[in-house]
Amino acid sequence: VSSLIDDLTALAVVAPFPLAILFAIYKFRTSGRVRIARPKLGLLNLGDADFTAILNEDRAALGSFFEDVVVSTDGRIPRCDVLFVYASIAPDGSVVNSPQSSVRQLAAGAGASLLVVASSNPGEHVVATVKNPGPRNASLVLTIDRKGDGFCRFFQKIFTLMKAGKTMPMAWAKVAPQHESVMPKYAPETVFLPEGKFVVFK
């Protein structure tokens, strides 16, 4: 318990972390981590040609972190550990052209521990999708602004740390401390919800 308190105190000094991040760290320290030795990346394009370019960018920049990469353009949800979704989010939070209405249901369909909506969507639509139902078995990253190549730079750093044994919340806290003075300028504008099991790629 004392080591946990020390860790949280140290983090609080560095930056004022959101309560969700602090809870994620507590959950990790008390429940351990799940190791995925050969992680599989799924890329699900629900917007056809609208998102082909950024999907290809992400595959080229991030594919080497994974044992296998599966691309789906026909609406079928690929089975994978990490699912990147390229789609428009409707004002009510539903996923346009999706076989499932919510991002949590998409994650469950893939069996993924992490789902990233990798296409930019309006902030109010992102807030709406967070409220939609579904199993909370995967952490979610919802993108508001990719910031050009900043998106790939950011996730390269995240996945590098995860391969070194850091969980997603710990990697996120290291790469993007929640304070304007230390937040990287290139970092994409996102909403991160640490849910489900915390995994490492090792």
Language-model regions, residue ranges each:
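Conserved strand-to-helix beginnings and helix N-cap segments that scaffold or border functional pockets
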Residues: 52, 96-100, 127, 152-155
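A domain-level signal for caspase-like cysteine endopeptidase catalytic cores
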Residues: 26-90, 98
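Short acidic, S/G/P-rich loop/turn micro-motifs used as interaction or catalytic elements
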Residues: 48-51, 88-94, 121-124, 147-149
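A short acidic, amphipathic alpha-helical/loop segment
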Residues: 54, 58, 106, 125-132
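Active-site-proximal C-terminal subdomain of hydrolase catalytic domains
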Residues: 113-202
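Hydrophobic, helix-forming membrane-interacting segments
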Residues: 2-30
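A short, glycine/acidic-enriched catalytic loop
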Residues: 88-110
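Structured loop/turn residues at beta-strand edges in well-structured enzyme cores
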Residues: 78, 110, 136
